[in-house]
């Protein structure tokens, strides 16, 4: 079951018509992103940071909580066959990170999908997407993993919220420039 997600400024309910079909597909691909990435090659997940902070307005709106409410944040980098491909940021109210979403604190290098897709009590919102820009909470994290030099690349991200027992877990995933080359390449049988 999917539920609506409040649209914070800049997030779109559909991909712009100017995007190519490949980007549209990945921005709104249902199910676990990790499963899709594994179809392209060997996926490695590296935790970049985990910490408590106050929820930025953009993300607070996406979780239907007050801005600056205490939240727990987890940022990870997923690589495919050694190529940095996706930066993801997940957050939940701090209290929920000790309650219904405490599993996110124990994942280590496992993907969130390991705890999200096996519980029928979890519901996911619809996806929204946007081109990341300065001021979006994980823009700096994503841009730091993009190729250096030249103009800033177009970094497209998607996000959705998972709900369990009335508590949100907001997940945003940004596709790095190198990902699009991997996604375009024919996949060898495994």
Swiss-Prot record:
Keywords: Cytoplasm, Lyase, Pyruvate, Ubiquinone biosynthesis. One of its GO terms (molecular function) is chorismate lyase activity. The keyword Cytoplasm applies. One of its GO terms (biological process) is ubiquinone biosynthetic process. GO terms for cellular component: cytosol. Substrate binds at residues 74, 112, 173. Coiled coil: none annotated. Its EC number is 4.1.3.40. SUPFAM superfamilies: Chorismate lyase-like. It comes from the Bacteria. Pathway: Cofactor biosynthesis; ubiquinone biosynthesis. It is found in: Cytoplasm. InterPro entries: Chorismate--pyruvate_lyase, Chorismate_lyase_/UTRA_dom_sf. It catalyses: chorismate = 4-hydroxybenzoate + pyruvate. Removes the pyruvyl group from chorismate, with concomitant aromatization of the ring, to provide 4-hydroxybenzoate (4HB) for the ubiquinone pathway. Belongs to the UbiC family. This is Probable chorismate pyruvate-lyase. The gene is ubiC.
């Amino acid at each position: 079951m999917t539920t609506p997600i409040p649209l914070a400024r800049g997030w779109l309910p559909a991909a712009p018509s100017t995007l190519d079909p490949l980007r549209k597909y990945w921005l709104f691909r249902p199910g676990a992103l990790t499963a899709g990435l594994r179809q392209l090659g060997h996926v490695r997940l590296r935790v970049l940071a985990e910490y408590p902070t106050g929820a930025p307005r953009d993300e607070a709106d996406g979780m239907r909580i007050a801005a600056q409410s205490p939240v727990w944040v987890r940022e990870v980098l997923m690589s495919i066959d050694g190529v940095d491909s996706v930066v993801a940021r997940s957050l939940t109210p701090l209290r929920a990170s000790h309650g219904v979403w405490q599993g996110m604190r124990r994942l280590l290098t496992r993907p969130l999908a390991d705890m999200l897709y096996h519980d029928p009590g979890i519901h996911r919102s619809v996806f929204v997407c946007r081109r990341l820009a300065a001021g979006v909470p994980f823009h700096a994290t994503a841009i730091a993993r993009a190729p250096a030099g030249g103009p800033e690349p177009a970094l497209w991200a998607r996000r959705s919220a998972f709900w369990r027992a009335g508590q949100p877990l907001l997940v945003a995933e940004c596709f790095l420039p190198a990902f699009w080359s991997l996604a375009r390449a024919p996949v060898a049988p495994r």
